[in-house]
Amino acid sequence: MQPFTTHTGLAVIIDSANIDTDQIIPKQFLSKVTRDGFGVHLFHDWRYLDDAGDQPNPEFSLNRPRYQGASILLAKENFGCGSSREHAPWALADFGLRVIIAPSFADIFYGNAINNGLLPVRLTEAEVVQLMREVEAEEGAQVSVDLQAQTVTSPSGASFSFEIAPSARHNLLNGLDAIGISLGYGEAIAAYETEIPGWRA
């Protein structure tokens, strides 16, 4: 998993609350078990005018030319609600997003995002609204996120602080997913196994 320390990128806005995981990645695209290839289906029902995904919806923010290449998503409260599908952060990350900023997240989505190297940032509703206004006002506006300092810097230079659990912060800074964390205990596991008595018939 790629370590996350600081990130500055183009921000895109989805000005909606209660965006659930079925909207993030609809159920018909969940047959794959690898993490790759989900980005094309991200927000499928909003991004496309047809079921096949051949006709992009020009009104949807992710399809607007000014937001192409965005790596930070701004949304409203309760982002990632609904089912616990891990495919949701897979799709967001595969699309190229590194940070989701919202006033609140569904708990399971929040944990899944961190476990997959995606940083969910909780700011107040007023701070998110300010970010949205600044991003909408200036084409190409970028937002900076510093996980070390736990700050978000708006296009105008305003700085907002956010909280994150120390363990989650440590894992993201060091690029540790569940497998990486387990490997860190390799020596301790090996030492324990040498102390286990052999099987006796």
From Swiss-Prot:
The keyword Nucleotidyltransferase does not apply. It catalyses: (2R,3S)-3-isopropylmalate = (2S)-2-isopropylmalate. Pathway: Amino-acid biosynthesis; L-leucine biosynthesis; L-leucine from 3-methyl-2-oxobutanoate: step 2/4. It is an enzyme of class 4 (lyase). The keyword Amino-acid biosynthesis applies. Its EC number is 4.2.1.33. It comes from the Bacteria. GO terms for molecular function: 3-isopropylmalate dehydratase activity. HAMAP family: LeuD_type1 (MF_01031). PANTHER family: 3-ISOPROPYLMALATE DEHYDRATASE SMALL SUBUNIT (PTHR43345:SF5), 3-ISOPROPYLMALATE DEHYDRATASE SMALL SUBUNIT 2-RELATED-RELATED (PTHR43345). Heterodimer of LeuC and LeuD. Catalyzes the isomerization between 2-isopropylmalate and 3-isopropylmalate, via the formation of 2-isopropylmaleate. Belongs to the LeuD family. LeuD type 1 subfamily. This is 3-isopropylmalate dehydratase small subunit. It comes from Shewanella loihica (strain ATCC BAA-1088 / PV-4). The lineage of its organism: Bacteria, Pseudomonadati, Pseudomonadota, Gammaproteobacteria, Alteromonadales. The gene is leuD.
